[in-house]
A protein has these predicted regions:
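Substrate-recognition "cap/lid" segment bordering the active-site pocket of phosphatases
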Residues: 118-143
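Residues at the starts of beta-strands that form the adenosine-phosphate
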Residues: 110
Length: 143
């Protein structure tokens, strides 16, 4: 059998939600607040969780059937206000996140985050969990 060459990566890029951290509780809380405020009460937590990773506008469109860009932008703005209150308090790192990232950093590997979650929110959460210069790059939804 031919030998498969081992690849030595020098950079690892991670998504944030459901890869490094679980923010599903905060996401569900924020969506539920906005949706219920507008009369959308039949949407389950599972339905909301299945939209994680999409933009907020895409998620609201999937959950409500609304396609009007102005209305979706309004929902996004409301969600952002809710997230200022609930997101970080309801986000946790997965148990293997810090050991894995520490192992990579000790090997001199550069690490980064690319996510639809806004960069400022990722940075706000990370400030409480790891050194400021831990990630070499963070690209968020506003980028």
């Amino acid at each position: 059998m031919p030998k498969i060459p081992q690849m030595k990566y020098t950079v690892y890029l991670f998504d944030f939600d459901y890869t490094l951290a679980d923010s599903s509780r905060g996401i569900v809380t924020c969506f539920r607040s906005v949706l219920e405020r507008h009369g959308y009460t039949g949407i389950t937590d599972d339905m909301i969780k299945r939209t994680i990773g999409k933009t907020l506008e895409e998620s609201f469109s999937i959950l409500t059937g609304i396609t009007d860009a102005d209305q979706l932008e309004s929902f996004r703005q409301e969600y952002s206000k809710e997230a200022d209150i609930y997101m970080n308090a309801n986000t946790i790192l997965f148990p293997d996140t810090l050991p894995t990232l520490t192992h990579l950093k000790k090997q001199g590997i550069r690490i980064g985050i690319i996510s639809t979650k806004y960069r400022f929110r990722i940075l706000s959460f990370l400030r409480n969990h790891m050194p400021d210069d831990w990630f070499d790059i963070i690209i968020g939804g506003e980028d």
